[in-house]
Amino acid sequence: MVSRSAFLLFCVLFLATEETLASLFSSRLIHRFSDEGRASIKTPSSSDSLPNKQSLEYYRLLAESDFRRQRMNLGAKVQSLVPSEGSKTISSGNDFGWLHYTWIDIGTPSVSFLVALDTGSNLLWIPCNCVQCAPLTSTYYSSLATKDLNEYNPSSSSTSKVFLCSHKLCDSASDCESPKEQCPYTVNYLSGNTSSSGLLVEDILHLTYNTNNRLMNGSSSVKARVVIGCGKKQSGDYLDGVAPDGLMGLGPAEISVPSFLSKAGLMRNSFSLCFDEEDSGRIYFGDMGPSIQQSTPFLQLDNNKYSGYIVGVEACCIGNSCLKQTSFTTFIDSGQSFTYLPEEIYRKVALEIDRHINATSKNFEGVSWEYCYESSAEPKVPAIKLKFSHNNTFVIHKPLFVFQQSQGLVQFCLPISPSGQEGIGSIGQNYMRGYRMVFDRENMKLGWSPSKCQEDKIEPPQASPGSTSSPNPLPTDEQQSRGGHAVSPAIAGKTPSKTPSSSSSYSFSSIMRLFNSLLLLHWLASLM
């Protein structure tokens, strides 16, 4: 009887641990030109400053943003894919230049920031103790919030800690005179003299558990310790409103937010993105994707390291016909509106699509796409299929972008352009719509499955094998509070005595489930 009870107790504790390590955190994505974005990040006086969706002006704006992003990519020193300033030709004032944003809360007491999201970079940085930052007042931006943006001050947060040069994640340690100094950071871009620089700190990122797309109440929220760039000085396009309230890098490096959440035992090392018809969507931290998803491995390009989310396409197919010599390497870039292919492959794909279109070719003023048309009805064209290893296929069912009708005629284009880089392309958001894109960093692979985004039921993943405890990603003996007193780093299930709001990997629902299970176990034991 005793051994049976012990076995039952072990099973209960094991299941509780599994639940703990299989959590999901969700946040709403806000597309800067979506209806939601117009309502939530615009002042009433600027309601007419952005064009209507599906108008030619709307797609000119997105294409111009992509062009500037591509221009910066060619000169990037650090990141593989970087932000663009966005177009200033339509907005009557300064405008956000990124594609997707989300609200995050940092510190104690918490302060809100509307950060840009980027799968092509790694660091989370926010304006902080500003020496040279973009303006943070709402009146400066034609498409910003009715409230001002915030500036972070580490000394005002009781949970902030200095991040030292001695830490292995301090890439600028060679610039430090002493390992006890605070670690500096600089992110440089050659094009436009764009950069962000300052000092690294550690503080709390506030998260909320997600269950089947329902955000749970505040009692189930957790606080995760992450490394943050205290961005004192910005330059170039960052001063023009590219990301005035900061940027969250979602890249594969250890210093990215997903890496810290995983190492803290709060989630599996993976996240997913989905986009709805309004171009907004959701990001799910900890999502490994459904069992039915297809996948392909990420590629290592630079010094056998994963410098971004890069995959290899074996062939491009139009319908059931695969084109010869169309293999290439491509970035998966959620921060880009449209898709770019290497010149020689772009030409083959475009000509094959053009062969299936029975419509009049048309040049639209201000539209850079080469293959545009006008017709009495939208033509039916075969799907574009990107073929990966193991016969996995990414299907683009609607390869054309249709504009608003004009005088009874339908205007449409093939929204693909040459990438300008030999053998390298970039898949943008326009061809991700309708899919749940899973960035599985644990197994270093990209997953995808059909999705209606807001209707998806995202189930918590199974815990990873062997993840019964979480390694602490932060220093154990050199971490310091703002006042200079040594403070132990937070670990799963344990918090320092002087920082009661430190992260815990146990959700409220997990604890209640464990409590109820123990009551059941006690009742079963009494019957034996």
UniProtKB/Swiss-Prot annotation:
Q: Write down the membrane topology.
A: Lipid-anchor; GPI-anchor
Q: What class of enzyme is it?
A: hydrolase
GO MF, any single term: aspartic-type endopeptidase activity
Q: Which organism is it from?
A: Arabidopsis thaliana
Q: What is its EC number?
A: 3.4.23.-
Q: Which residues form a coiled coil?
A: none
Residues listed as glycosylation sites in the UniProt record:
193, 217, 358, 391
* A cellular component term, taken from the record's GO annotations: side of membrane
Matching entries from InterPro entries are given as: Aspartic_peptidase_A1, Aspartic_peptidase_AS, PEPTIDASE_A1, Peptidase_aspartic_dom_sf, TAXi_C, TAXi_N
Q: Cite the Peptidase A1 domain residue spans from the record.
A: 100-449
Gene3D superfamilies linked:
Acid Proteases
Q: Is Cytoplasm found in the keyword set?
A: no
**Is Nucleotidyltransferase given among the entry's keywords?**
no
* GO biological-process terms attached to the record: proteolysis
Which residues, if any, are the signal sequence?
A: 1-22
Residues at the active site: 118, 333
Which controlled-vocabulary keywords does the entry list?
Aspartyl protease, Cell membrane, Glycoprotein, GPI-anchor, Hydrolase, Lipoprotein, Membrane, Protease, Signal
- Put simply, this protein is called Aspartic proteinase-like protein 1
Subcellular location per UniProt equals: Cell membrane
| GPI-anchor amidated serine lipid sites | 503
Removed propeptide positions: 504-528
> Low complexity: which segments have biased composition?
494-503
Which stretches does the entry tag as region Disordered? 451-503
